[in-house]
Design a protein with these regions (language model features):
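Generic structural signal for well-ordered alpha-helices
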Residues: 34, 60, 81-85, 137, ...
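Glycine- and acidic-residue-enriched helix-capping/strand-helix junction motifs
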Residues: 17-30
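Canonical Radical SAM [4Fe-4S] cluster-binding loop centered on the CxxxCxxC motif
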Residues: 190-227
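Flexible loop/turn segments at secondary-structure boundaries
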Residues: 17-19, 173, 207-208, 218-220, ...
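Glycine-rich beta-alpha loop elements in corrinoid/cobalamin-binding modules
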Residues: 36-168
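Conserved SAM/AdoMet-binding glycine-rich loop
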Residues: 4-11, 67, 94, 98, ...
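N-terminal [4Fe-4S]-dependent radical SAM core
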Residues: 3-4, 152, 157-198
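Residue-level signal for the nucleotide or nucleotide-sugar donor/cofactor binding architecture
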Residues: 128, 224, 259
């Protein structure tokens, strides 16, 4: 008997209008989650990535999703909830709804508030989405009738009036285990639409600022392999060599804090000189503005004078 593949929708929804359509970034976040999930369950899943509400809903009418995962931020809450209502109207409870992202708080009392506020959501994923979401997909594939019988790692849900919470894995996923969504072509459709590229070389922030959502994160600062980072820069540059006006964004919490950062900056500058892209790099510098952070700016040279 041939089993049907699990249809998974991953959504990083954004308000798209005439003011924002030229400021859209590729959905790197769900790209990583999708790439990691594909790596583990390649022959058992079909994964679709979405940034546009209308594109997602159009696809949902022709392909019934089994799981829809949303990148949840407070600013896109209404968009997410609108799509959840539309999905429920189409397929009732025959679709699993998952919320994950930086606005999912790690405090237990906040968990209760989220469960009360969003009763249509089946599961909330904490921390790094790859671990919690893939653990959930493994449960759906292995025991589809008993998905919520036991806790799920890095996640919490509501069952019989109680909060059921899995083990906290924190920000500890070895980044060598995470495939590149760029190099696997998963983000090509967004690059083709001139979405701004977003590149991540490291994860975690060592600072505990009260005003920042990352201040409560627990884990280890880790770096992606330098070879992968350089290959991604090359890949993105080839896509955008004829579009030098598109801003290159670094998804670094503190660019200039890690010892590899000056090398990345130097590689960006050389790529700009040889390929013609990028001509504008946007990033957040190390908050302490150390010598290494200054070295990063020196290494970039005149790249931002385009």
């Amino acid at each position: 008997m041939i089993m049907r593949k699990l249809e998974i929708f991953l959504a990083d929804l954004f308000y798209i209008n005439r003011l924002t359509k030229y400021r859209l970034c590729v959905p790197l976040n769900i790209g990583y989650v999708g790439a990691y999930t594909r790596k583990l369950f390649d022959n058992e899943v079909n994964i679709h990535l979405f940034k546009d509400v209308n594109v997602l809903l159009g696809k949902a009418k022709s392909v019934k999703p089994d799981v829809v995962g949303f990148s949840f931020y407070y600013w896109n809450t209404n968009l997410n909830c609108f799509v959840v209502r539309q999905i429920r109207a189409l397929y009732k409870d025959d679709v699993r709804i998952v919320f994950g992202g930086p606005s999912i708080d790690s405090i237990n009392e906040e968990h209760r508030k989220l469960l009360v506020r969003f009763p249509e959501v089946d599961l909330f994923v904490e921390g790094e989405g790859e671990i919690g979401f893939s653990s959930f997909i493994e449960r759906v594939l292995s025991t589809p009738d008993k998905v919520f019988e036991d806790p799920i790692d890095s996640s919490f849900f509501h069952e019989d009036g109680e909060i059921v919470k899995g083990s906290e894995t924190g920000f500890t996923l070895p980044l060598t285990d995470v495939p590149s969504p760029y190099l696997n072509g998963y983000l090509d459709e967004f690059l083709a639409r001139s979405y701004m590229p977003l590149l991540q070389a490291t994860r975690m922030c060592p600072y505990t600022c009260n005003f920042c959502v990352s201040g409560k994160d627990k884990g280890v600062v880790r770096a992606f392999p330098m070879d992968t980072v350089k290959e991604e820069i090359d890949y993105i540059a080839r896509w955008n060599k004829d579009n030098p006006h598109i801003i290159f964004n670094l998804a670094e919490l503190n660019f200039g804090i890690n010892k590899q950062d000056p090398e990345i900056a130097e590689y960006l500058r050389k790529t700009s000189e040889t390929v013609g892209y990028p001509k504008s790099v946007y990033f957040y510098s190390d908050k302490r503005f150390t010598k290494r952070a200054r070295d990063v700016i020196d290494a970039l040279g005149d790249i931002n004078r385009y």
